[in-house]
Regions:
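Catalytic beta/alpha-barrel core
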Residues: 54-55, 69-83, 92-105, 115-127, ...
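Short beta-strand segments at enzyme active-site cores
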Residues: 32-39, 73-78, 177-179, 213-222
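Catalytic alpha/beta core domains of metabolic enzymes, predominantly
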Residues: 114-219
Length: 253
């Protein structure tokens, strides 16, 4: 099992340290490979007033402290080719956002680094069209594909478990299930995205039972006070229960 978990965006060293320490404790209990995630810039905002984050310089400096003190691997996302050089010496995994999953130059540049490349599958993309994304990843150290829900009308996402099964059976790369973004309601709150975190535990159990072994969860001590993605983020206090269930329902393929 592998779990990627952390806040939507990096807020401060103290904040990320608290989250990373608790997530690592829970994952270590089960012998799960843990990766801390956080964004330095949330470029894809519903509104011009949406909070973007503290920036690359502060985030990468704090990430180095996290890595040194907690001995955790790190993931962050990039939105342009030039951002890759800002992060590649610090993080272990470079993430391509879902809305940029077809951007050839961005994918190929990320694949030239020594980092693993995690590509979020766009909400608009069919599972069988992932082969086009993978055709752009030659030379990568490793590639992961992350499922984060499928568009189902306005402001609505659904989880297509048959699509996840197709990707597990078809592609020779890890398929990560992003549980918390799958319960998002994009733009659903007018000037920000909505969501419903109460669906997270059930979706995590279902994915584990069907053979998913890689999970992505955004967590926060006080999600309703988070600068972004609060409605779909998991309470940090609930993280252990969800991970316990993932282990309990795990199906060995």
């Amino acid at each position: 099992l592998r779990i990627i978990a952390g806040p939507c965006q990096h807020e401060s060293l103290e904040h990320s340290m608290k989250i990373a320490r608790e997530c690592k404790r829970v994952c270590d209990k089960h012998g799960i490979d843990y990766i801390f995630k956080a964004s330095f810039d949330k470029a894809n905002r519903t509104s011009i007033n949406g909070e973007r984050g503290v920036g690359a310089d502060v985030t990468m400096s704090d990430f180095q402290v996290l890595k040194n003190e907690l001995k955790v691997n790190l993931l962050t996302d990039v939105h342009s080719v030039e951002q890759i050089e800002w992060v590649e010496k610090i993080v272990d995994v470079i993430q391509i956002p879902a809305f940029l999953c077809r951007q050839t130059d961005l994918i190929q540049a990320a694949c030239k680094t020594d980092c693993v490349v995690n590509i979020k599958k766009g909400q608009f993309l069919a599972p069988w069209d992932v082969k086009g994304i993978l055709s752009k990843t030659e030379g990568a150290k490793a590639v992961w594909i992350t499922e984060r829900g499928t568009s189902f009308g306005y402001n609505t996402l659904v989880v297509d478990f048959t699509g996840i099964q197709h990707m597990l059976d078809t592609y020779n790369v890890p398929i990560v299930f992003d549980v918390t973004h799958s319960v998002q309601r994009p733009g659903g709150n007018g000037t920000s995205s909505g969501g419903n975190r109460r669906y997270v535990p059930g979706l995590a159990r279902a994915a584990s039972a069907m053979g998913v072994t890689d999970f992505f969860l955004e967590v926060h001590p006080v999600p309703d006070m988070a600068p972004s993605d609060g409605p779909n983020m998991l309470h940090l206090d609930d993280f252990e229960r969800v991970v316990d269930d993932i282990v309990r329902y795990s199906y060995s393929r």
